[in-house]
From Swiss-Prot:
Keyword Magnesium in record: yes
Keyword Acyltransferase among record annotations: no
Organism: Fusobacterium nucleatum subsp. nucleatum (strain ATCC 25586 / DSM 15643 / BCRC 10681 / CIP 101130 / JCM 8532 / KCTC 2640 / LMG 13131 / VPI 4355)
Name recorded for this polypeptide: Thiamine-phosphate synthase
UniProt catalytic activity: 2-[(2R,5Z)-2-carboxy-4-methylthiazol-5(2H)-ylidene]ethyl phosphate + 4-amino-2-methyl-5-(diphosphooxymethyl)pyrimidine + 2 H(+) = thiamine phosphate + CO2 + diphosphate; 2-(2-carboxy-4-methylthiazol-5-yl)ethyl phosphate + 4-amino-2-methyl-5-(diphosphooxymethyl)pyrimidine + 2 H(+) = thiamine phosphate + CO2 + diphosphate; 4-methyl-5-(2-phosphooxyethyl)-thiazole + 4-amino-2-methyl-5-(diphosphooxymethyl)pyrimidine + H(+) = thiamine phosphate + diphosphate
CDD domains assigned to the protein according to its UniProt record, in alphabetical order: TMP_TenI
Record InterPro entries: Aldolase_TIM, ThiamineP_synth_sf, ThiamineP_synth_TenI, TMP_synthase
Family annotation (Pfam families): TMP-TENI (PF02581)
Record text on cofactor binding: Binds 1 Mg(2+) ion per subunit.
Amino acid sequence: MDLKDCKIYLVTDEKACNGKDFYKCIEESIKGGVKIVQLREKNISTKDFYKKALKVKEICKNYEVLFIINDRLDITQAVEADGVHLGQSDMPIEKAREILKDKFLIGATARNIEEAEKAQLLGADYIGSGAIFGTSTKDNAKRLEMEDLKKIVNSVKIPVFAIGGININNVWMLKNIGLQGVCSVSGILSEKDCKKAVENILKNFN
């Protein structure tokens, strides 16, 4: 799977599943058209993160979609994921690239042109930018204005994915601005039918 083939990017949050089976939600999302899954876990032990990552990797492998780990290079290497996503407060991109070589993808969060250009220069393979519509899954996420998102897209050559409160009702606003794709958390996982949610987001984005 190539990044250029990826339109819908799922970022996980088990709480967003609202009691539905976490792994089933991921599988149904992939069936709907998700091409990248990022496992994001902030408050569990390394051992539990590792176990969870192995299960999610198995699902991704079965459907031949990309599997990304949030923040943790050790888990990324241990489960042989496809890559790691690094926020501004995570390990520096250049250090991660030095450790991972070219065997893994590196995604980076960028909220302005400077961060985006720096991420590209330091070896990031793609950028995640937001929060474009605000978000319920990150307490400290500041909203990114549409004009600023467009500037980020135009400032780099690597793929850019928008993130933050994206769902079936607002994704159409992100059409035709040069994005590679969109990331969603609750816009997919909190819906009753995850597969249908992805299909509808994809339909409204294309």
